[in-house]
């Protein structure tokens, strides 16, 4: 279980969340909604500035979620 103020990994975050942030400021955040900033899923499952989109949405080239 992730504790606010501590660094996380995706395994620490709950369902519908990812671990995002820089090296020293990682935190659990909800998956991105329509029109919200996002980061595309990657093979390392690491995110620096946002989570992937919620199901049914895709992260566009401009890094915002839109309906598929």
From Swiss-Prot:
Disulfide bonds join 8-19, 13-28, 18-51, 38-59, 53-65. Expressed by the venom gland. Keywords: Disulfide bond, Pyrrolidone carboxylic acid, Secreted. It comes from the Eukaryota. The modification Pyrrolidone carboxylic acid is found at residue 1. It is found in: Secreted. Non-toxic to mice and insects. It comes from Phoneutria nigriventer (Brazilian armed spider). Belongs to the u-CNTX family. GO terms for cellular component: extracellular region. The keyword Secreted applies. This is U19-ctenitoxin-Pn1a.
